[in-house]
UniProtKB/Swiss-Prot annotation:
This is Methyl-accepting chemotaxis protein CtpL. It is a multi-pass membrane protein. It is found in: Cell inner membrane. The gene is ctpL. The chain crosses the membrane at residues 6-26, 306-326. Residues 327-380 form the HAMP domain.
Length: 657
């Protein structure tokens, strides 16, 4: 048997399991949907019956509306059409009760609806007629109010009205309750009413004639038969006769109307009971469907569980079959592990032997044995080539070592030349830089000296202006001192005036004291004047002291300014001498700058020449280093090749052929 066939068999088994599982799941889902569909159909039938059939029938019985009856019939027909959707057993259970209800709705229910009107309408009309007759009797009594016999009518008429009211109440109770036992109350009140009618009939007439002409009299008058009409008027009868006949007729008709009303009520009750029984029969039939629906659901669930159990058993069997095939294949392939492990260790001396009847595995055995023979021959050839590579790599390593030593010496010499040229170039660049810095410094010094000349010139002018200003300030301060002396003379005059005022105030106070009470006011004024004179004298003394200090400060300022003028004049003379010396310094610095620029230009040219020589030596040294690197790499590769040759020889020796 081939491996492909085993693989196809496993695949077929797995596909079979998947297909069977899918079919089972699909069938289970469909089977589980069926009970829910049946339950939905059952609930829908129940709801439709209650809302569309039972409700319309009840409304038809209450109102007699034919539209409700037609709606109920249409709903029953719709339910009958929906029965084939149910299982046959359920449909057979529900069909008879629906058919009976549909036949009843089309026949007896229609008659019951016709009786849906008010069954006591005839009795109400008869009672209204009796009420009207009694009212006419009252009008009859009013017309004969002057006669003594009229009073005998009032008591029976009043009692007749009372019994008529009781009759209406008893009739209403009978109709509303539909209780036959209440019919005796109606008959008793009717008998009382007849009794009063008999009493009224036994009373004598009151002689009130009927003055209204009939329609035949009017017609006779129109045709010219006036004589006949007058003859008829002469034969007019008492109004009480007609009222007696009408009352007797109404009382005789009322029992017949009562009997017909009772029959109508009984028929309505019977039809309502029949309708309720048929509706209950349909509801009972629908109720019996629920256990059947649930039983159908349990049956389908049992089938689903049975089929699912079978599928699980089938899956287990297929899994066991696949496991058995895989174990057999694993045992056969396990025989390859020792031989392949020996090959991995380099031992090709043992061939592979598989004991199997599978054609593909036998082909695999032959292929692996051919591979063992090929690898053995290949390892032998590699062993021979490894010996040759080891000898060649040894020779190449010796040549590379000699070449590497020569190139190293050459690289060392070129490196020394490069370093010497670098030092020389650095020295020349330093000289050129120093000369350039000297030229720059000389230029900067010249500019600084020129700036110093300008500053000294400006300072010299400023000093001269300062001397002039200081001299002007000294003169101003001297004038201030002179003015202060003038203020002192003025203060002397003020002081003398204050002393005289004080003496005058003292004399005035003495004279006021001599005058007594009359000179008291003048004494006060004199005291104030004396106080003012004393304050003036004090203020004058303070001003005199202040002016003295001011004059002292002015004299000191004049002396200081004179000293500053002398110092400024000496400084101006020194600045003039410094300006002349700076002119000589500027000329010398200019000469130094020119010479430094020439030195810098020569150094720059020498530095450029040395730089070119150094760049050439750098390239020579770089080429030597690159050659040294390549030769070193070649030597490393030769050494690696020698090592690889040795490793290859050692590795090939590990194989056993």
């Amino acid at each position: 048997m081939r491996l492909k066939q085993l693989t196809n068999l496993n695949t077929l088994l797995l596909l079979t399991v998947c297909l069977a599982l899918g079919i089972t799941l699909w069938w289970s889902q469909r089977a589980m949907e069926r009970p829910f569909q049946l339950l939905d159909q059952y609930l829908e039938l129940s709801q439709r019956f209650d809302e569309q059939v039972a409700r319309n029938i009840r409304q038809y019985l209450g109102s007699g509306d034919a539209v409700r009856q037609q709606a109920a019939l249409q709903a029953l027909e719709s339910l009958a059409e929906a029965l084939p959707e149910l299982p046959p057993d359920l449909a057979r259970t529900l069909a008879p009760s629906l058919a009976e209800l549909r036949e009843f709705s089309a026949g007896d229910l229609l008659a019951a609806g016709k009786l849906a009107g008010d069954p006591q309408g005839l009795l109400l009309q008869a009672e209204r007629d009796l009420t009207g007759n009694l009212e006419q009797w009252s009008a009859y009594l009013d017309a004969a109010a002057g006669q003594p016999q009229a009073g005998a009518y009032r008591t029976p008429l009043l009692l007749a009205s009372l019994h008529l009211t009781r009759l209406s109440l008893a009739r209403a109770k009978l109709v509303e309750s539909a209780n036959p036992a209440l019919a005796g109350d109606v008959e008793r009140e009717l008998a009382n009413l007849r009794e009063q009618a008999g009493r009224i009939e036994a009373l004598p007439l009151l002689g009130v004639l009927d003055e209204q002409r009939s329609a035949s009299d009017d017609f006779a008058a129109m045709m010219g038969l006036a004589g006949d009409a007058e003859a008829g008027a002469g034969n007019a009868e008492d109004r009480g006769v007609a009222l007696r006949r009408e009352l007797a007729s109404l009382l005789q008709r009322y029992p017949d109307e009562l009997r017909r009303t009772r029959d109508l009520i009984e028929r309505r009750q019977q039809l309502s009971a029949d309708t309720g029984a048929r509706l209950d029969a349909v509801r009972q039939a629908l109720a019996t469907l629920e256990p059947q629906v649930r039983g159908e659901r349990q049956r389908l669930q049992g089938q689903v569980r049975l089929i699912q159990g079978g599928m699980i058993a089938l899956i287990l069997l297929i899994a066991l079959a696949i496991d058995s095939l895989q174990r057999r294949l694993a045992r056969v392939l396990g025989q390859l592990v020792p031989a392949l492990s020996a090959w991995a260790d380099g031992d090709f001396s043992r061939p592979i032997s598989l004991r199997t009847r599978t054609e593909d595995l036998r082909n695999l055995e032959d292929s692996l044995n051919r591979l063992r023979s090929f690898l053995a021959e290949l390892v032998g050839a590699i062993h021979r080539r490894a010996e040759q590579v080891a000898g060649s790599s040894q020779t190449l390593a010796e040549v590379s070592s000699g070449l590497h030593a020569g190139v190293e010496r050459q690289a060392g010499d070129t490196g020394q030349i490069r370093d010497a040229l670098g030092d020389m170039e650095a020295a020349i660049q330093q000289v050129a830089g120093d000369a350039s810095q000297t030229a720059d410094a000389s230029r900067s010094a010249g500019q600084a000296v020129e700036h110093g000349q300008r500053v000294i010139g400006e300072s010299l002018g400023g000093l001269r202006e300062l001397v002039d200003e200081v001299q002007g300030n000294a003169q101003s301060i001297e004038r201030l001192a002179e003015e202060s002396a003038t203020i002192g003379s003025v203060l002397t005059v003020i002081r003398s005036i204050a002393e005289q005022t004080n003496l005058l105030a003292l004399n005035a106070a003495i004279e006021a004291a001599r005058a007594g009470d009359q000179g008291r006011g003048f004494a006060v004024v004199a005291e104030e004047v004396r106080s003012l004179a004393q304050r003036t004298a004090g203020a004058t003394e303070e001003i005199q002291q202040l002016i003295g200090r001011l004059q002292q400060a002015a004299r000191q300022s004049v002396e200081a300014m004179r000293s500053q003028v002398e110092h400024a004049e000496r400084t101006a003379e020194q600045a003039g001498a410094a300006e002349g010396a700076l002119d000589e310094v500027v000329a010398a610095i200019h000469t130094i700058g020119v010479m430094a620029e020439r030195i810098a230009e020569g150094s720059t040219q020498q530095s450029q020449a040395v730089g070119e020589i150094r760049s050439h030596s750098e390239r020579i040294h770089a080429l030597g280093g690159e050659n040294l690197r390549l030769i070193g790499h070649s030597r490393e590769q030769g050494e690696q090749l020698r090592q690889l040759g040795g490793d290859l020889r050692t590795t090939v020796q590990a194989f056993r052929l």
